C-alpha cells in the first residue's frame, strides 16, 4: 500500500485511503501549513506575480494573434480542396471539384388557426340593430 506525503505539512499520512487524505486536507494544521507555504512563496524575490495595470491579461502571452494557431491551415470555404492537395490526390483530378448543390430548404408549414366555438361568436350587427330598435321605440312613444 503506497504512503502519501503531504508537501505542505512535510509528513507521511498514516491513513492512505481517500477518506483519510480528504480528512487530512480539511484539517486545521494542513490548512494553516498551506497558507504559510503560499505566503512564503510570495515573500521570496524570485516569485513576482504578474502586474496588469488597467489592462486585461493576454490570453496567449507567447503567441502573436494571427487568427489561426501555428501549424494549422487557415479556414477555407467548403467544397474547395486546399492548394497543396490538388496534385497529391491519387488518380489526379482533371480540374476543380464541382460545387455541391445547396441543401433544399423545406417549405414552411401553413399555420393552422383553430376555429372559434360556435357559442362564442358575437355578431355586432345584431346587437347594434336591437339597440337601434329600442331607442327608436322609446323616441316614438
From Swiss-Prot:
One matching Pfam family: zf-U1
Keyword set includes Cell inner membrane: no
Zinc finger (Matrin-type): 4-36
Example GO molecular function: U1 snRNA binding
Annotated GO biological process: mRNA 5'-splice site recognition; spliceosomal snRNP assembly
Mitochondrion found in the keyword field: no
Gene Ontology CC terms, in alphabetical order: commitment complex; U1 snRNP; U2-type prespliceosome
Disulfide bridge partners, by residue number: none
Summary of the function given for this chain in its UniProt record: Component of the spliceosomal U1 snRNP, which is essential for recognition of the pre-mRNA 5' splice-site and the subsequent assembly of the spliceosome. U1-C is directly involved in initial 5' splice-site recognition for both constitutive and regulated alternative splicing. The interaction with the 5' splice-site seems to precede base-pairing between the pre-mRNA and the U1 snRNA. Stimulates commitment or early (E) complex formation by stabilizing the base pairing of the 5' end of the U1 snRNA and the 5' splice-site region.
Subunit: U1 snRNP is composed of the 7 core Sm proteins B/B', D1, D2, D3, E, F and G that assemble in a heptameric protein ring on the Sm site of the small nuclear RNA to form the core snRNP, and at least 3 U1 snRNP-specific proteins U1-70K, U1-A and U1-C. U1-C interacts with U1 snRNA and the 5' splice-site region of the pre-mRNA.
Protein name: U1 small nuclear ribonucleoprotein C
Taxonomic placement: Eukaryota, Sar, Alveolata, Apicomplexa, Aconoidasida
Amino acid at each position: 500500500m503506497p504512503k502519501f506525503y503531504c508537501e505542505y505539512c512535510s509528513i507521511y499520512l498514516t491513513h492512505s485511503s481517500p477518506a483519510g487524505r480528504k480528512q487530512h486536507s480539511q484539517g486545521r494544521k494542513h490548512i494553516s501549513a498551506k497558507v504559510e507555504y503560499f505566503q512564503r512563496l510570495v515573500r521570496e524575490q524570485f516569485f513576482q506575480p504578474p502586474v496588469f495595470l488597467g489592462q486585461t491579461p493576454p490570453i496567449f502571452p507567447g503567441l502573436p494573434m494571427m487568427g489561426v494557431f501555428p501549424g494549422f491551415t487557415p479556414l477555407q470555404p467548403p467544397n474547395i480542396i486546399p492548394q497543396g492537395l490538388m496534385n497529391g490526390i491519387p488518380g489526379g483530378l482533371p480540374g476543380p471539384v464541382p460545387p455541391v448543390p445547396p441543401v433544399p430548404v423545406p417549405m414552411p408549414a401553413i399555420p393552422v388557426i383553430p376555429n372559434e366555438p360556435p357559442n362564442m361568436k358575437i355578431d355586432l350587427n345584431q346587437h347594434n340593430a336591437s339597440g337601434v330598435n329600442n331607442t327608436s321605440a322609446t323616441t316614438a312613444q
